[in-house]
Amino acid sequence: MLPCCEPLPLQTEKLELPSISQVHTRGPVDIPWYNHHAAERPLLSGDKLPALSLPTASQPPISGQSYRTSYEEASASHNASARTSLSGTAPVINEARSPPQSADLAAGGQGRLSLDSSAPQEFSIPQNTVGDSYYTNPTAIGSMNHTQPYMDVHSSHLSSAQPYASQAATAGGIAHYPQYHQQPPVLQPASTTYGPASSYQYAYPGGVTSSQPGPQPPTTSVSSQVPAQLLPLPVTSHTVAPAGYGNNTGTPMQGYVYDATGQVAPPGAKPRVTATLWEDEGSLCYQVEARGVCVARREDNHMINGTKLLNVAGMTRGRRDGILKSEKVRHVVKIGPMHLKGVWIPFERALEFANKEKITDLLYPLFVHNIGGLLYHPTNQTRTNMVVQESQQRRLEGPQATRASQGPQPPALHHHHSLQTPVPSHMSQPHAMTSQSAARPGLDRAHTFPTPPASASSLMGITNQGSSYEWGNQGMNSGVPNTQPLSIDTTLSNARSMPTTPATTPPGSNMQGMQAYQSQSGYDNSKSYYSAAPPSHPQYAPQQPLTQPMAPYGQTMPANTYIKNDMAPPTARTSGGPSDVEQADVKADRYAQTNGHVSNGAGEPVPEHEPEYVQHDSAGYNTNRGSYTYTTNPSVGSLAGDHSQLASDMSGSPSQQNGSGRMTPRTSGAPPQWASGYNTPPRSAAVSSLYNSVSETRGASANGTTDNYSVASNPAPGYSTGMNGPLGSGKRMREDDDVDQIVRPDSRGAEYESKRRKTLTEATVGGPVGGVPLGLQPMKAGGVMARRR
């Protein structure tokens, strides 16, 4: 290529655009613009190309050497539109040529130019810098569009096959930027090489698309740009590009024949399929991501999530919902992972929609009949098969069977484990699963598809529910350490697993799962003295035994129990917490538990206010309190933790569940106790137990009833404690209780207040781990409010 020399002066006045017919004198030009094969023929030196000039401004032909400079200068002087300099690679005829008339150019249309450029691509794109300069002046994008038609002409007129052709393609694609990327191929004398290489390499991803309005494959930028939509170009030049943009743009590739069946992969498309187990439906779901949207297809009935499908098409919500509402056969899913929610429609209807919206190729291989064969293909075939087999097994067994108390071996768990291999060993579950998951590579939900652990957990939760026994384990399945996973799963699967919990919950594994919470056990330990103190009081003494029943609550503290317990309130609580009738007893009971009382009321005539208070939130609230109590008496909780955990699971008290849910978040912190309470609406119940723990003396002196009552009054503080954390907070809470007194039910009365004060008087034994300092007393007030709730 000649070195760029001083740019030739632009002679705009004398240039005349040759008529289009002249331009067409080239053999290739005569051929339909889109016929890139014809265009592929290199220009002969004899071929005359019109000077490249923008339709708006005529440009004197520039010698090859000066192309770049002239191009740059021209672009500067003539704006992008004037830029027609060709790359030095192809010598340009020095004789000034008139650029095709703008009208002619307009008539040629971009499509024409694009086609031409796709052909020999020898035509240089006047506006686009061609050859070397094409990259220099990508600025002529706007002008490029004008020039493109003309680019065709130029291409035909260029004396020799020039990389200009590639430029033309680029310009056509307005891929001058990409063009630059593409240029290297373009530079090659043979436009053919340039066309396909640059086209597919850069064009489809690059500017070509920009030139073309939308989805046109940018590859073979010129040809595909304009004409791609109009005429299918030979696959040869587009073969690569289609692969790239076939999927990217969603428009069929030029050389690619649109496959309305969805069975044929667009050129260059790589089937990317992931699978997830939809526990709720008991089916494996294949997922394909297009335009950032995960479209799922069920393996059992092959229904497809129509909502996500139409989202891929970029349809508005109103139109999408209207279309889906009119579907006769549809399955509406409102609960579950986000990518599985929506309106599921039959496979055939989904395919029709995809074809109407021209997104079938984008969704490949969603509609492939044997989509399972593409899953993790080919490297993970074994794992894929295992997943599919397990899914089928689950279907055979039925989701219910899995959920029923299958014990530690629910196939669902297997799935989860398999999916979440990370979990396998941590649950020493008896489940064959563990070994299975160990054996097979883990298909973490996260790995398999973009589903948040939460959604996975819901699935897992079900699994757990199926084998609630496995809560801890399953929580682990989520890939979190057993302990943590438990807390996670616990939250999601508490309600679900409650029913199965009694039968399936393995205390050992659960405890393991809760180990993390157990670390909170330290918190319990801090309250250990509370446990000890309760022993000092008869009331408290029972507390320790109660600890076990309470353990579910205390469990929050023990972590092991805590998690499970969160899931279900202790038996006593279960009966008491939920039922108002037992309120007094429950309250006492709860407090007893909270305070470590073994007896349900410990026979203590807990002030009626307290039961009354319990009644306010009694069932759930007391249960919550129990949780708080646990917080207060973590040591007790710890003691009873294991069996307590089981007990709470068995009891399946909703409040406990709530506690667990809340516990999970808060429990992560030192105060699982109040976390548990938090699950139920944050209530002071735990506080009261905390209170009792903190002011065991108070409880004792107040007499069992008083103590319990104190506990009740404590609940507000306890709540505060739960919020504040440490028992110290609980004390503060008591102080708050004094303030709270007004807020609290009259039933509490002075007695309650005195009890509270007693508690307040007590030295802060040490709040829940990370408990809030007295400064957090306001929290207590909040706790009181929660209690009122």
Swiss-Prot record:
Basic and acidic residues bias (residue ranges): 741-754
GO molecular function: DNA-binding transcription factor activity; sequence-specific DNA binding
Annotated region (Disordered), positions in chain: 50-131, 205-224, 389-459, 487-543, 616-789
Record localization: Nucleus
Region called Nuclear localization domain, residue ranges: 731-758
Keyword Transmembrane helix belongs to the record: no
Keywords: Conidiation, DNA-binding, Nucleus, Sporulation, Transcription, Transcription regulation
DNA-binding region: 306-327
A GO cellular component annotation in the UniProt record: nucleus
Entry function: Transcription factor that regulates asexual reproduction. Binds the StuA-response elements (StRE) with the consensus sequence 5'-(A/T)CGCG(T/A)N(A/C)-3' at the promoters of target genes.
Record protein name field: Cell pattern formation-associated protein stuA
Organism: Aspergillus flavus (strain ATCC 200026 / FGSC A1120 / IAM 13836 / NRRL 3357 / JCM 12722 / SRRC 167)
Lineage of the species this protein comes from: Eukaryota, Fungi, Dikarya, Ascomycota, Pezizomycotina
